[in-house]
Amino acid sequence: MEQILSMNGGSGEQSYANNSIGQSTCLSRSMPVLKQAVLDSCCTNLPETVTMADLGCSSGPNTFYAVSEITSIIYKRCCQLGRSAPEFRVFLNDLPGNDFNTVFQSLPAYQGKLREENGPGFGPLYVAGVPGSFYGRLFPLKTLHFVHSSSSLHWLSQVPPELTDKANPLINKWKIFISKTSPPAVISSYLTQFRKDFSLFLKLRSEEVAPEGRMVLTFRGRTTADPTSDESCLLWDYLGQAFQDLVAEGLVEEERLDTYNTPYYEPHPEEIQAEIEKEGSFTLDRLEVIALPWDSVNGGIKDDRATTAKRMAKAIRAVNESMFRSHFGEDILDPLFHRFIEIMAADTKEVEHVSLVISLIRKA
């Protein structure tokens, strides 16, 4: 997974930078939770250098969003209190395939904008890239004061091993993710993998975050207890139908479809709370649900379903293309998403896009 998954880089038509309106909207909606966590931390004595990490930073207009908010809030609050503002050290993390070149090409303009908005006394701000999986250690012990992550933790570290066991694999016939036709063992394997990964994530960050340090994490989730509901699975079902069409036309082998499984899971709030309590290193300060409308990919513009389907196809492709290409090859991508658009446009179902935002405090 670490060597395969990456958002589409650059700034072209299929890039993540140009097809991440939904993620940007979700990030914006999570800001009240982030701002409160930062303000609460300002009630204590801040260190001379505040160190923060953004995990799953990707590339594009969303990359510096949270960092800008955190640093500006701290600086303005220190000015209000008559304190000396700290220096800032920022780590931007993503998998090695991330387009870090685009990120750092945009850095000078971003730093200039921060100084313009906050005044000449702001900073300095030092930024470094940290390629690697957040399911492994990334930073020295007790060095982080803030950790932020958005639209990343729904990705698993791997496909559940029960689905890839060559001796006796579980078969999720005709599907690429959990669905109503999935055997119970397939659904259980996804939950087990999520629990393992999320617990590991908390354990690793507990080693890196200083006592009383904060984490604000936003990721896709669900409000219904049933993990096979349309709320979690509808778009994946559309993709599954599109793949089935390609199999029928001889463009994809049936075995290739049956051996592809998406390393992804949308947890319920109770599943999140249970793992936080079980791991024990963090206090859950807040947990909120963000529900975006079905057509949020349009950026607030009311469009017909066919236009929405085209935008949704681009958004999904920008995120999943690297994995589809690795397993199925380059040639199936255009016909796959052409069929996805047709399937989605012909349907009438509408579901909200649900994310969970949690604010955590490292126990002393």
Swiss-Prot record:
Q: Which residues form a coiled coil?
A: none
Q: Which InterPro entries match?
A: MeTrfase_7, MeTrfase_capping, SAM-dependent_MTases_sf
Q: Where is this site: Involved in substrate discrimination?
A: H148, R220, E330
Q: Where does S-adenosyl-L-homocysteine bind?
A: Y16, C57, N62, D94, L95, S133, F134
Q: EC no.? A: 2.1.1.-
Please list the cofactors this protein needs. Mg(2+)
SUPFAM superfamilies documented for this protein = S-adenosyl-L-methionine-dependent methyltransferases (SSF53335)
What would be an example GO MF term here? Answer: S-adenosylmethionine-dependent methyltransferase activity
Pfam families annotated for this entry? Methyltransf_7
Q: Where does Mg(2+) bind?
A: N172, D258, Y260, N261
For this chain's UniProt record, which GO biological process terms are given? methylation
Kindly report, in one word, the top-level EC class recorded for this enzyme: transferase
- Keyword terms of this UniProt record: Magnesium, Metal-binding, Methyltransferase, Transferase
What does the record say about how the cofactor binds?
A: Binds 1 Mg(2+) ion per subunit.
The family note in this entry says: Belongs to the methyltransferase superfamily. Type-7 methyltransferase family.
* Stated name of the protein: Probable methyltransferase TCM_000168
Q: What species does this protein belong to?
A: Theobroma cacao
Q: What is the lineage of its organism?
A: Eukaryota, Viridiplantae, Streptophyta, Embryophyta, Tracheophyta
